[in-house]
């Protein structure tokens, strides 16, 4: 079957003396026409531009699932696919069936929540419409224009994932599209360091750094638009004792599942419950509880934390006290308390002290990632292996890999 050449650019950091700038490197992938159609369709869905793309007979979930199945098959064929420290093993967390089943809801959630976020950068579709066929019809329809649009869309997607995003669902939808294209790319003309595993490592490290740096809230959230939500949360937040500040997410999620034993949990949940009722009415999702945990973790938890009195914003460093260390709880940012809540939620079997240790590790890892992203053009896979060993993360990685996607309610 005939294949076509797809050219696309990826962005890299470059430091020359004291000057920092971005460099774009061009890559070449070989694809069949059906793959180009599928990826053009999916990237247009990602950027909400599908009304300007003329591709008939495709459905979002079917095409996205094909993409995931192809990636998983290639990962599993690799000789180191079972290596716990390998990038493909880590990326496999985004490819599980439990996660994929939730993808149809992701677009619905992102569409509803866009009121609270700044718009993302998108490619200029009309710039890629040829005068002969596409521009008269107002839609991209010919293969050449599809390739040109897809090339620009991949470059825009790559830059957007590096710069940060509105909600964590966006990179979880976007990264598999880039991984698929990278897996189809010929690296024979590139230096040895530029290879499939290292490009995926670069992508994951940037994703993780953006999560840890709170870019979603600090750079992409319309905080003015969120003020009514914060005000609603402020009415009930004092029902949460300050000592339970790091358990808020766990308590709210348990109450969503009618499993909370906390006396004030029903009242504490009310702002989020009202928000989800309105969301269900607007989106026509019949079982809104299926997406409740996702919206809570990805968006609404932060509204609760922003409503907290200042004395609630304390970390758990006091739990690290020993005979050589008289640490006390310290003031922390809303972002750190949010991270503390997420860690407490994910690592359910950990003691509070163990969770505090994980958070301290993550703060140190953030600095290491920042340095490698600034000073290295490409982050090699060996960086992840070293971080896992240096910070003794085997247990945490194992728990994440074994996690049955509790963060995505499957009821």
Curated annotation (Swiss-Prot):
Keywords: Late protein
Pfam family, one: Baculo_p48
InterPro entries named among the record's database cross-references: P48_Baculovir
Family in the record: Belongs to the baculoviridae p48 family.
Protein name per its UniProtKB record: p48 protein
The encoding gene: P48
